[in-house]
Amino acid sequence: MMLDQNGVQRTNKKLKNPLVLFFYPKDDTPGCTIEVCGFRDKYDLFKVLGAEVWGVSNGNSASHLSFANKNKLQYPLLCDTNDSLRKIFKVPKVLGLLDGRVTYVIDRKGFVRHIYRDLLNGPAHIKEAIRVLKELQNE
């Protein structure tokens, strides 16, 4: 379980839908803003595809709340302040310093069905998640 920007405890154990869990390096940075806004702009499509969307970085709830409000995000940002979720999902640090950018598509049974890694191309994460969710609908 992990808190989001509003102090709500989140766990995928209660979800009945697929989950797109995307790890991004830091709030209020140019590349991360492009990525989170990309997920925001396609949020209705994610809902049509039956998926939840959660973002994760090591920012605290105040940082996430400000970032979410500024960018009008409709989905939760999880506060992984001690990198515990990042470690569970084995999200790498680039050069041992910069938090990686990785997206996981988790099916409704809780299985990771796809992992997409690309530090520099945040928008590709959205396209890849949508592609995989469409494939899951055809199973």
Question: Locations of the language-model features?
Answer:
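Chalcogenol-based redox active-site neighborhoods
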Residues: 1-139
